[in-house]
């Protein structure tokens, strides 16, 4: 009897972890505009939800089942968030302000395959170089490391753009083929492609 009770708790906990993980991922996919994938995930999500809820409702007199359900819910949220971090869907825009306008910031970032826009700006203590970079979220940490290598004192702020329209990278972004900074094309190849256009 006790063994069956533990099995029931484990099933309720596991079902809810899976359900909430899928729910979290589905919500994030929806927010990122991946509607069809989100709809596909939701089919599995609702089946698991009904099974888990049914197990709890059939045994409402057992408080431990409700506790397992609640703990599974919280655990599922954490796991869902971790899955989203690993998937790193979408893009980020990083704005960088360097106190040293003479640094070859733009050139070095472009050599690594990033889409870069730069302009001269003026801060409290004089001239600045402002740089805006668009990159897939999965390359975010690598970009920060590159920026720190170029200018350890650079001011960095990042945000997630809601819409991307126009500009050099739009076709690649729409196809999900924004260049991987790790696998940068050979400069000669890029130049020859530009000449052909």
UniProtKB/Swiss-Prot annotation:
Residues annotated as transmembrane: 5-25, 37-57, 63-83
UniProt keyword annotation of Phosphoprotein present: no
UniProt cross-references to InterPro entries, sorted A to Z: DUF2179 (IPR019264), DUF5698 (IPR044035), UPF0316 (IPR022930)
Pfam entry (one): DUF2179
Keywords: Cell membrane, Membrane, Transmembrane, Transmembrane helix
A GO cellular-component term linked to this record: plasma membrane
Keyword Cell membrane: yes
Membrane topology: Multi-pass membrane protein
Location(s) in or outside the cell: Cell membrane
Coiled coil: none
Family, per entry: Belongs to the UPF0316 family.
NCBIfam families membership: PRK04164.1-5
PANTHER family: UPF0316 PROTEIN YEBE
Protein name: UPF0316 protein OB0738
């Amino acid at each position: 009897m006790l063994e069956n009770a533990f099995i029931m708790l484990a099933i309720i906990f596991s079902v809810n972890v899976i359900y909430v993980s899928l729910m979290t991922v589905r919500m994030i996919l929806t927010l990122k505009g991946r509607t069809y994938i989100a709809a596909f995930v939701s089919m599995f999500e609702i089946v698991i939800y009904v099974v888990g809820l049914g197990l709890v409702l059939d045994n409402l007199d057992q408080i431990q089942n409700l506790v397992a359900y609640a703990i599974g819910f919280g655990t599922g949220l954490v796991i869902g968030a971790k899955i989203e971090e690993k998937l790193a869907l979408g893009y980020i825009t990083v704005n960088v302000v360097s106190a040293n306008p003479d640094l070859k910031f733009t050139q070095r970032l472009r050599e690594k395959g990033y889409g870069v826009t730069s302009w001269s700006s003026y801060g409290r203590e004089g001239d600045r170089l402002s740089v805006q970079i668009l990159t897939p979220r999965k390359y975010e940490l690598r970009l920060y490391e590159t920026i720190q290598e170029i200018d350890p004192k650079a001011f960095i702020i990042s945000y997630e753009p809601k819409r991307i329209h126009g500009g050099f990278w739009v076709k690649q972004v729409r196809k999900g083929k924004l260049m991987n900074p790790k696998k940068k094309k050979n400069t000669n190849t890029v130049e020859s492609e530009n000449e052909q256009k």
